[in-house]
């Protein structure tokens, strides 16, 4: 990881390959609920969008239940689905109207404009990893990237401006079909393997893990495995931040069981625990 200082003395981090051999493994990340806490931003915008049209404010548990179905990774579509389930089908807004209301709540300004002018819920997001986390991944010999269903301006904001990453490997909304379609995951994996001069997807390629926080993320990895069955894949999962509170312990247990039933092969306590999980997995592979 190359570190450089901008004029404002802010450290930036740029992914690069400094290994003489291919990386030991690839670690791909979802962003929402894994790299940043969106409980007060994307999820709040979803709730506020539903409230705007129905007068009803969905709870975090209701959103979790919807996400647990593995079908509603796109929050605009999730907003519409919650409105349908409230019995407002005959009065449903258009998809474009949903997007406009949601975007105003989340960004509070032009998504493609200067982030300094955004006044929306995006300003509430806290980071779940420090910038140095990516340096640690590189030191461990892991190549990394991001496969997210969030809008590109939102992804770039958290990765580049908040975390200081330079040109991070990213598949965002619009770059590939929505998850759980595995095309984005497969595309980024192939890109990273080529960039690091590693063998292509298959039995000779480095192992690949994907860390997400929803059933949809787990399904995405499982479908990638179906597409390329001779590649070593690992579905890793972490419960979203709002379930880490002491009072949410029971709900968190239920949520993690749901992730396991969907096919997650390991549940992590935190995103940072991915390094230990990867080392354990590579150790298992060495014993094969």
Which positions does each model-derived feature cover?
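Short, acidic loop-to-helix structural element flanking the phosphoryl-transfer center
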Residues: 107-146, 150-158, 182
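Non-catalytic pre-domain segments flanking phosphatase-related domains
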Residues: 2-29, 81, 86-97, 279-288
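Active-site neighborhood of HAD-like aspartate-dependent phosphohydrolases
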Residues: 18-64
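Substrate-recognition "cap/lid" segment bordering the active-site pocket of phosphatases
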Residues: 145, 150-209, 215-229, 233
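Short, surface-exposed acidic
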Residues: 54-67, 87-106, 165-168, 196-206
């Amino acid at each position: 990881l190359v570190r450089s200082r901008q004029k404002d003395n802010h450290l930036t981090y740029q992914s690069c390959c400094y290994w003489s051999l291919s990386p030991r493994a690839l670690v791909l990340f979802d962003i929402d609920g894994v790299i940043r806490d969106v409980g007060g931003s994307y999820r709040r915008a979803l709730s506020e969008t539903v409230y705007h049209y129905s007068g009803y404010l969905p709870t975090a548990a209701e959103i979790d239940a919807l996400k647990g179905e593995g079908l509603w990774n796109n929050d605009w579509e999730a907003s519409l689905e919650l409105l349908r389930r409230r019995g407002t089908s005959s009065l449903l807004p258009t998809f474009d109207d949903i997007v406009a209301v949601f975007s105003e709540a989340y960004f509070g300004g032009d998504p493609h404009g200067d982030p300094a002018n955004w006044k929306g819920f995006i300003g509430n997001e806290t980071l779940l990893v420090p910038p140095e986390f990516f340096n640690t991944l590189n030191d461990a010999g892991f190549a990394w990237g991001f496969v997210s269903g969030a809008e590109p301006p939102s992804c770039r904001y958290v990765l580049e401006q908040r975390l200081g990453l330079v040109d991070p490997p990213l598949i965002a909304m619009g770059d590939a079909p929505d998850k759980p379609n595995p095309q984005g995951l497969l595309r980024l994996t192939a890109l990273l393997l080529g960039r690091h001069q590693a063998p292509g997807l298959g039995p000779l390629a480095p192992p690949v893990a994907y860390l997400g926080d929803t059933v949809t993320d787990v399904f995405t990895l499982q479908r990638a495995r179906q597409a390329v069955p001779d590649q070593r894949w690992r579905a890793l999962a972490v419960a979203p931040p709002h379930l880490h509170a002491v009072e949410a312990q029971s709900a968190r247990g239920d949520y993690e069981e749901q992730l396991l039933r969907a096919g997650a092969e390991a549940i992590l306590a935190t995103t940072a625990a991915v390094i230990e999980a990867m080392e354990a997995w590579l150790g298992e592979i060495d014993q094969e």
